[in-house]
């Protein structure tokens, strides 16, 4: 159950980062303030909830194991950036993502 909490904390953290990115996207000048307030408000909510879940994780998992698992954030953000904003990702970046996933598998198998 705690591993599910860790994944959910990671996803909420990523959602917060993506909301921050969305807040920076261009909108018409007359809608800009509402746009920024909405997306930054959502970012704060996601990041706040992620922090509370993260504290639960830290109570149950050694920090040396839990913290590296947050590198999943790099994977989620890359996938979301490609899907949502059609951002280009170089082969070198994909190689880095693969190494991150490999590292998480290695760390996860030691628990």
From Swiss-Prot:
Residues 40-109 form the EamA domain. GO terms for molecular function: carbohydrate derivative transmembrane transporter activity. It is a multi-pass membrane protein. One of its GO terms (biological process) is lipopolysaccharide biosynthetic process. GO terms for cellular component: plasma membrane. Pathway: Bacterial outer membrane biogenesis; lipopolysaccharide biosynthesis. InterPro entries: EamA_dom (IPR000620), Flippase_ArnE (IPR022883), Small_drug/metabolite_transptr (IPR000390). Keywords: Cell inner membrane, Cell membrane, Lipid A biosynthesis, Lipid biosynthesis, Lipid metabolism, Lipopolysaccharide biosynthesis, Membrane, Transmembrane, Transmembrane helix, Transport. The chain crosses the membrane at residues 36-56, 61-81, 88-108. It is found in: Cell inner membrane. Heterodimer of ArnE and ArnF. Translocates 4-amino-4-deoxy-L-arabinose-phosphoundecaprenol (alpha-L-Ara4N-phosphoundecaprenol) from the cytoplasmic to the periplasmic side of the inner membrane. Belongs to the ArnE family. This is Probable 4-amino-4-deoxy-L-arabinose-phosphoundecaprenol flippase subunit ArnE. It comes from Shigella flexneri.
């Amino acid at each position: 159950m705690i591993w599910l909490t860790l994944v959910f904390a990671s996803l909420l953290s990523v959602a917060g980062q993506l909301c921050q990115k969305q807040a920076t996207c261009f909108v018409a000048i007359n809608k800009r303030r509402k746009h920024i307030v909405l997306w930054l408000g959502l970012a704060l909510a996601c990041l706040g909830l992620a922090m509370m879940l993260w504290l639960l994780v830290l109570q149950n998992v050694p920090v040396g194991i839990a913290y590296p698992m947050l590198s999943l954030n790099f994977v989620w953000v890359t996938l979301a950036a490609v899907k949502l904003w059609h951002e280009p990702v170089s082969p070198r970046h994909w190689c880095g993502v693969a190494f991150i996933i490999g590292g998480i598998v290695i760390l996860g198998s030691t628990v």
